[in-house]
């Protein structure tokens, strides 16, 4: 599936500043994991996570709905400002990221390491 459809639906959720989507190999399949950066003072609770999923389901398709939604404080970006999906996918799968020098904020990758929700 394309991530653009998910990102366009996130724009409809005012609490979400931006998001990052990856496919995680999980249980002999691939599941969608959505990381969101939220507005200041907003916490990701079950109600907000469910609303995010419902917004994506209605605006895209059921296949686009993330299995896991997690809040993070920062998203890694390339020096040109693009969100680094591939780098996050590698970290989540326990692999190293070789081109960290291409990232403007490589320290943000640590936010995605060894997350118990993704084990």
Predicted regions and their residues:
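Adenylate-forming
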Residues: 1-11, 35-46, 60-68
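Short acidic amphipathic segments
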Residues: 10-19
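Conserved beta-loop-beta connector loops within the AMP-binding
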Residues: 15, 43-45, 84
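Conserved C-terminal "lid"/linker of ANL adenylate-forming enzymes
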Residues: 20-25, 33-34, 53-119
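Short, compositionally biased leader-like segments
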Residues: 24, 44-49
